[in-house]
Regions:
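Catalytic-center loop of serine/cysteine hydrolases
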Residues: 4-17, 38, 48-167
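Short glycine/proline-enriched loop/turn "hinge" motifs that connect secondary-structure elements
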Residues: 18-22
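Short beta-strand segments enriched in small/hydrophobic residues
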Residues: 23-38
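Short, solvent-exposed loop/turn segments at secondary-structure boundaries
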Residues: 39-43
């Protein structure tokens, strides 16, 4: 999956074409699961999903699919292999949110669809009063996990961090 560029040169009346590929990892961030939450809490979970998509989409070294794709995949209950085949997704990010009073827990996992395994699972506890701060932090944390811990090509991973910090 990627973009293709063709360079042509005229060498002794022969055209020589060189295929160069550039490939960006493709991410799909599934809507945060909200079973058992109030309508207001479901709105917060949707906001977390949208914020992660927005934050990661601004980073040019990866391609993040739209929220409409995420919500469609959830609504149609697409399986991981169908998501990979239909959209070329490399990494799938899923999560769930639990709320008790003013305290919340967000569980996230990153699945490498090529390897067909969960490569990272983490939880984040926070106070609902800090929901916007949490939304802002999550995209950066996911980016760091993808580039450093998952080593999406170790050289590529460190390039991602450098490019991200220079934005």
């Amino acid at each position: 999956v990627g973009m293709f560029y063709f360079n042509t040169s005229n060498d002794s009346d022969k055209q020589v074409a060189t295929l160069q590929t550039t490939s960006k990892p493709i991410l799909l961030i599934m809507p945060i699961k909200t079973s058992g939450l109030t309508d207001d809490q479901k709105g917060f979970a949707r906001g977390i999903t949208e914020s992660m998509i927005s934050t990661l989409s601004s980073y040019q070294a990866i391609k993040v699919l739209s929220s409409s794709t995420s919500f469609h995949a959830q609504k149609t209950e697409m399986l991981d292999n169908a998501i990979r085949e239909n959209y070329g997704v490399d990494y799938l990010i899923r999560g769930s949110m639990q709320v008790m009073g003013n305290n919340a827990r967000l569980n996230l996992e990153i699945t490498d669809l090529k390897a067909a395994k969960v490569t990272l699972s983490k939880k984040k506890d926070f106070n609902m009063e800090n929901i916007f701060k949490v939304q802002d932090e999550l995209g950066n944390e996911i980016l760091n996990e993808l580039s450093i811990n998952l080593g999406v090509g170790s050289a590529q991973g460190s390039d991602w961090v450098k490019q991200w910090k220079s934005m």
